[in-house]
Amino acid sequence: MSVQHWLDQWGIQLPANNAETCRLQVADDPELVLEKVPGGWLMAMRLGRLPSPMLLGVQLQLLQANGPFSALAPVHVAADSAGDLVLWVEVQEGHVDVPTLNNWYAKLCQGHKHFSPLLEAVPDQPRPASGARLFV
């Protein structure tokens, strides 16, 4: 099954010029970037700039998203060369069917909805110092 079969459900066509990267907008969802990789495509959604400072809880959630037991798996979080965080999943042509691609797309959207608000810059405010950090 190809990515084009998946896009057919929305009446979207991949560029005919054999572009390496294309940006798509499906309904009101965040922009989806498709980038050609050997043997398939990378589906990605930009989350935004890596904020500084970032709350420790947000850092831990981002790290957990890459774990094998994450609700978003097989979607991953990474930073691109511009310093933006992106959600991504690799699609191997001929190895994934349309329902699976729909599921992965839903996970990209779910991750975007969850993480985008958390990545807004945190005001630099003094925080009380403690001798230990406790996690509950």
Which sequence ranges carry the predicted segments?
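Short, internal acidic amphipathic alpha-helical interface segments
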Residues: 46-86
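Generic alpha-helical secondary structure
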Residues: 3, 55-56, 101
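Charge-rich, low-complexity N-terminal segments
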Residues: 1-31, 70-72, 78-80
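Non-catalytic surface loops within mature trypsin-like serine protease
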Residues: 28, 49, 91-93
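Short, highly charged C-terminal tails/helix-capping segments
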Residues: 119-136
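Ampiphathic alpha-helical segments that act as solvent-exposed interaction surfaces
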Residues: 61-63, 68-70, 91-124
